[in-house]
């Protein structure tokens, strides 16, 4: 277990680990317990009622945050011809085909946050799986990153669309903004993320889908959320 410093221990005193806080209290606390000198990220951690060892119960998809992530998202697009031109026009940071494939394959280059590809390019980038896969950057139809409408995809990811997937413990992690965001903006992102997440319940997942939810700022303590304060039908 990592050792926590003096500042962490000080802010930890503000949080009752046995209490589930309503959404407004939780957001107030996440701001109070942020102690980094930089503008930390507020992240939502959700324990799902799934068996992650079963492929048909794994959750992967995208969540669109109405107030964005507060992050400058670097988007790479694998495309050629007219699609490449559309991607550049939409604001993609890197656009190319064989040149980008070789750079990633030979140098292990991954200085981007999202990779989008047109379907016809996928056969070429399959060999990049060993580099992109472990970093969660491999284009996927489920994540909306394999598409012919590259311009729309670029705009959506730049505006606050994020890919989500459960980890090996059945938890899912979603950045919902920066500590500097207004509380109302964080709240809107949080509720929207929950609404979208509840719609991703796998058919073979029985019982309660949302088991537990915690929010925390970068390096800050976790704050338990009272799920009943969210009024979501899929929580029960």
Curated annotation (Swiss-Prot):
Source taxon at top rank: Bacteria
- InterPro entries, alphabetized: Ribosom_uL1_bac-type, Ribosomal_uL1, Ribosomal_uL1-like, Ribosomal_uL1/biogenesis, Ribosomal_uL1_3-a/b-sand, Ribosomal_uL1_CS
What biological-process terms (Gene Ontology) are attached? regulation of translation; translation
Which SUPFAM superfamilies did the record assign? Ribosomal protein L1 (SSF56808)
The molecular function GO annotations come to:
rRNA binding; structural constituent of ribosome; tRNA binding
- Per UniProt, which keywords does this protein have? Repressor, Ribonucleoprotein, Ribosomal protein, RNA-binding, rRNA-binding, Translation regulation, tRNA-binding
UniProt-listed Pfam families: Ribosomal_L1
GO CC term, one of those recorded: large ribosomal subunit
Query: What Gene3D superfamilies does the record point to?
Result: 3.30.190.20, 3.40.50.790
NCBIfam families, per database record: rplA_bact
Give the UniProt family note: Belongs to the universal ribosomal protein uL1 family.
Record's function text: Binds directly to 23S rRNA. The L1 stalk is quite mobile in the ribosome, and is involved in E site tRNA release.
Please give the subunit comment from the record. Answer: Part of the 50S ribosomal subunit.
**Name of the protein:** Large ribosomal subunit protein uL1
Source organism (scientific name): Petrotoga mobilis (strain DSM 10674 / SJ95)
